[in-house]
Structure formats: structure tokens, C-alpha cells
Design a protein with these regions (language model features):
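Soluble catalytic domains of membrane acyltransferases
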Residues: 30-145
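Membrane-anchoring hydrophobic helices of lipid-metabolizing enzymes
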Residues: 1-49
Length: 146
């Protein structure tokens, strides 16, 4: 991936990363016995979009990464950046690590997300800021106004 990035072959790198992450995510879900039914992909507009999701469990992220048909990153808690193997793939996906405890840093992360959108990358955001314990949307983080 590094060589493709250095050679400026970003689209090729993105295609390889997206395919690898989709395959990994789908295998993980299958091994866990999760059956996924996807409806409505045809309703997602072309180009960069922001996917807004509540975050109810451990399989939300693999489901989104496995079944959304375009390269996209996640706005993720900064703690995820400390996990070596995951960190590398998240960076290639265009993930942005958000410090929920530091408003200035969080605003910079959101600006970074805006720049990614302008470059044509979609982003997934979990505006509640953490996994929810119910099927109801919780309060959004104060920095997120959608």
C-alpha cells in the first residue's frame, strides 16, 4: 500500500484496501454467524456522502465496512489509533481519530473529515460518540450538529 501511495496511485490503493476490508468484514461476520440483509443501496447518491449511524454493538463497523459499496472512512475514537494492526488499515481507509475529551482537537478532526468529503471520500460517523445500550438514538455529542 505504501508503494502505491508513494507512486500517487491512490485510486488503485483505495480499490485494493476497500476490497480487502470488505472481504475481511464479511468473513468475520460469517464466522460469527451473522446474517446480513442489505436493502436500499440504490438510494445512496453518487459521490461522497456522510453515513450517520447509531452504534449498538461490535458488529456495526464490520457490517458497514463489508456492505457499503464505496471507499469510506470512519470518525473513530482516538483510542482505536493505539491498536497496531487496526490502526494501519484505518489510516488507509481514511479514518479520522477524534479526541472526545478535547474540543479543539475534535473540531480539527471534523474539519479533516470535511476535507476528505471534498476529495470524494465518504465518511461514517456515530454521533452518539459510543455504543448505545438501547435501540433508541441517544444524545449526539455536543460537537456534532447534523
Amino acid at each position: 500500500m505504501k508503494k502505491l501511495t508513494q507512486a500517487g496511485k491512490i485510486e488503485e490503493r483505495d480499490a485494493i484496501v476497500t476490497e480487502a476490508v470488505q472481504k475481511w468484514s464479511r468473513r468475520l461476520l460469517k464466522l460469527a454467524g451473522v446474517k446480513v440483509t442489505v436493502q436500499g443501496l440504490e438510494n445512496i447518491p453518487e459521490g461522497a456522502v456522510v453515513f450517520v449511524s447509531n452504534h449498538q454493538g461490535l458488529f456495526d463497523i464490520p457490517t458497514l465496512l463489508g456492505y457499503l459499496d464505496r471507499p469510506h472512512g470512519l470518525i473513530a475514537k482516538k483510542e482505536a489509533e493505539k491498536i497496531p494492526m487496526i490502526r494501519t488499515w484505518m489510516r488507509y481507509l481514511g479514518c479520522i481519530f477524534l479526541d472526545r475529551e478535547n474540543a479543539r482537537s475534535a473540531m480539527n478532526s471534523l474539519r479533516e473529515g470535511t476535507e476528505l468529503l471534498k476529495k470524494g471520500y465518504s465518511i461514517t460517523i456515530f454521533p452518539e460518540g459510543t455504543r448505545s445500550r438501547s435501540d433508541q438514538m441517544g444524545d449526539f455529542l455536543s460537537l456534532i450538529h447534523i
